[in-house]
Amino acid sequence: MTTTAARMDFETTLKGKYPAKRHAQRVADYIRNKMPGASGVLYLEGRATKLLEDNDEAEPFRQRRYFYYLTGCPLADCHYMYDLDADKSTLFIPPIDPDSVIWSGLPVSVDEAKQRWDVDDVKYTSDVNATLAHVGSSKPKGSSVFALANQVSDKVTFLEFDNKNFSILKEAIEVTRVVKDEYELAIMAKANEISSDGHKMVMQKVKHVQNERELEAVFLGHCIAKGARNQAYHSIVASGRAAATLHYVPNNADMAGKLNLLLDAGGEWDCYASDITRTFPINGKFTKESREIYDIVLKMQNECIAALKEGVLWDDVHLLAHKIAIDGLLQIGILQGDKDEILESRTSVAFFPHGLGHYLGMDTHDTGGNPNYADKDTMFRYLRVRGRLPAGSVITVEPGIYFCNFIIEPFLKDPKHSKYINADVLEKYWDVGGVRIEDNLVITKDGTYNLTTAPKDPEEMEKIIQQS
């Protein structure tokens, strides 16, 4: 069963605080489960202000995800400590710098920080070492400080702790991040709402522009206007045959004479990503060949979404997508021969070379997927999630079929594969470029609900474009 996030009252949820304390407790529980009797503190640092290497401008700031997960704090130059034994969290914020106030205004105060973020105490970063020393000296013998490797400032000392563990904290946060709580899902619903509307706006403009970069500007402008200033990743705005390049970067080609546009773009809300792809006809009407491919990909997505629920093996769903792709490509004549033999030969990888999807959260390719990029089976090598899906996880479902010369030509030259590909029929489809459809799904006990509301029905998209 699939429902849509439009029915989620996420705005009410977002009026509360980001549940940082509960995240810290979950991470602590994981560590204690791995290390019974663990005593000590978790210690993290947010991202520091950093200038570009050859001038006095600051680099664009993005908070460290591990730090944000335990604090909800987007400020630069902050530190954090969580006392495992006392269940007490402390956020350290930069003290007031009078010289900085002249240029940037007053920073967040201690009292404001206490009101804004879900932490038990707030101090200045000038108190970090003294606080660590005080807490460490009160701990029993064998206490530990748990921190992230290569993310501890030289000026910070852990002298009062007997042990320093730089491995398990990263593992603990990455595992606990897989299952989202209600607040995290509300953030992602917000990001999806803004981004879905942005995709629709691009559909409305696609007939009226000449270059891909103009459509990138439409999407970015909409996100910024709605408060989503950061993008989860570099947008892919690929027209014509460029859509066969999975992570197309330039976004600056003229679109005259091309059939379709593939838009893979997602805004970010409070450090959480959306990741949405739509493919639609530039002139408002799919060609016969484009519509055939689109219908195959839409069927791949719909049937894979219908197969999802808690405990489903993601590898099996990816395999299902390939089976549907093979059936569709056989029906239109691009593939020929026995479908089971085609599946066994992995010839369908020529047209669907990537994994079906990935976990989504603070990172676009979020933690916990356990991929195996050394897999000798080419069908599964780029599958970013391996294993069973837990309820509360968010995963993208993004099947695609692509006509990329660089990928397909070696298959045409290999007798093992070429016997299953009708090159004469294939010739009619190169200009389709590539079709991908991507939604963001929350896994539930009995099914899913879809955070993504961007139009994907082919007739609806054609109507939006034609009436714009």
From Swiss-Prot:
Keywords: Aminopeptidase, Hydrolase, Manganese, Metal-binding, Metalloprotease, Protease. Mn(2+) 1 binds at residues 275, 398, 438. It comes from Neurospora crassa (strain ATCC 24698 / 74-OR23-1A / CBS 708.71 / DSM 1257 / FGSC 987). The keyword Lipoprotein does not apply. Catalyzes the removal of a penultimate prolyl residue from the N-termini of peptides. Belongs to the peptidase M24B family. It catalyses: Release of any N-terminal amino acid, including proline, that is linked to proline, even from a dipeptide or tripeptide. Binds 2 manganese ions per subunit. InterPro entries: Aminopep_P_N, Creatin/AminoP/Spt16_N, Creatinase/aminopeptidase-like, Pept_M24, X-Pro_dipept-like. Its EC number is 3.4.11.9. Pfam families: AMP_N, Peptidase_M24. SUPFAM superfamilies: Creatinase/aminopeptidase (SSF55920), Creatinase/prolidase N-terminal domain (SSF53092). One of its GO terms (biological process) is proteolysis. GO terms for molecular function: manganese ion binding; metalloaminopeptidase activity; peptidase activity. Its cofactor is Mn(2+). Mn(2+) 2 binds at residues 264, 275, 438. This is Probable Xaa-Pro aminopeptidase NCU11288. Signal peptide: none annotated.
